[in-house]
Amino acid sequence: MNFSITLKIIASLLAIYLLIVLYVYVKQRSLLYLPNIDNYEDESLNVAAENIYIKNTDNINLRSLYYEHPANTKNTLLMFHGNAGPIENRFYKINKLSKYKQNILLISWRSYSGNEGNPTEEGLYDDARSAIKWLEDKDINIKDIIIYGESLGTAVSIEVAQKASFKGIILEAPFTSMIDAAKYHYPYLPVGIMLKDKYLSDQKIKNINSPILIMHAMGDDIVPFRMGKTMFNLANEPKYNYFIDEDKHLVTYDEKLMKNMDNFYKVLKVNE
């Protein structure tokens, strides 16, 4: 093979690589945010939750579910879901977590669950802050709110939790940053300079002083367990973990998990 042919092959491979980089750069948000994926448990809602709409600062009405506990409590669980699927796919969590003396607000992000808009990092932060304001308008104080983040929702949880003293924080399958997560899935791409939405959770979690529970499956093939462990190590006390080896990406809501949740809720004194 002569030198000119070698150069042509190299040039062709480089062109293909650059096309891949360009494609991923242009499509990155459609690869990250997956509102139409239906890959979670299918379960009917067993509590009387109300369909509500929370308006964010971009005047988008966010479809949400609000369960008001019959005990007339101020304790409220605010849930931020992950990057895939509608709020219906989280009904099983509401069914389980309604056992505690708390209200539950589960919001859906812009473009999810039939909402308008396009998801971005700043957009999701705005959606979360709008949900907090909605609760405050119902005379529910920050100190009575427990933030629950699932996967992508953990990054949003950490962003808002570093700026206020919430009653508690629950993180399910947290990642250190979107840069690290993207490197795991696309090790051949320069994701550090490509990503628009970086979600730098590892730089923010040290600013949280609320009690925190981190749950992560050791067999997670989407967000590696090492990221959850790193986030736990970076978190301030008081902190607790539920690390389980049987599950994949999201932890199973079984007796073992609920026992750990019971212990965390005792720390938060929710049922008193």
Regions found by a protein language model. Give the residues of each.
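C-terminal catalytic histidine-bearing segment of alpha/beta-hydrolase fold enzymes
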Residues: 230-233, 237-272
